Amino acid sequence: MASSKLLKERIESIQDTRKITNAMYLISSSKLRKARKNYQNVLPYFTRMRDTISRVVPHLPDEPVHPFFHERQREDGDPRRAYLVLTADKGMAGSFNQNVLKLLLEKADRNDRFYVIGQVGYRALRKDPRLVQEFQYGATAPSLQRARDITVDAIDDFKSGKLDEIYLIYTKIQNALTSEPVMVRLLPLDREHLQPAPRGLGDPRGEVELVPDAWTVFEQTAPIYMHGMIFGLSLIHISEPTR
């Protein structure tokens, strides 16, 4: 039978662990509130940006097809894909990171490229020859400029024909207990998906004038829209591994 001294030490150890756990909970709750507040603050901007793009798309010419909509077909039938993978900078998240990485490896082929955000993803894939770029700072402190840094090279390679498709893989949070890995296509864009919503009664939107032309305006705004997707998801993403 354990002595009273050992029992006392065990009780004290459990109490200390509880204090640490409570402190971690308070910190993570604060980070979650801050991240969600930041997301809500920037959401109107990116909503308006998407609305702007959807109003430009109908004015684009059918020919030539803008590169962002170009569905390429290679002779070998093997498209060159890039995957932007959003993971955490910490590993205390159970399946949060593992499910994202599992989905990546299930979908990727040998000729694909990986652009990894977060230290966990980098550590898991650092020996994989398909890893071409990593952003270990991107998960902890996301910003619009960092989101641009993450996407600009992949977008340039798509426009030049080095890449045929670009995908984003991240964790979609359903609620406090449920999440799932999700893969969405960034490029080529789906023209039908970007059509403007029908204008209702009292809609303040008027006719749009595109200067110098629709092609140029779309060329400038579409990358910003994609940067915003990365940034917005990152704001929510950073709070989850410490919840």
For the regions a protein language model found, what residue spans apply to each?
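C-terminal beta-strand-loop-alpha-helix "lid" module of Rossmann-like NAD(P)-dependent dehydrogenases
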Residues: 1-235, 239, 243
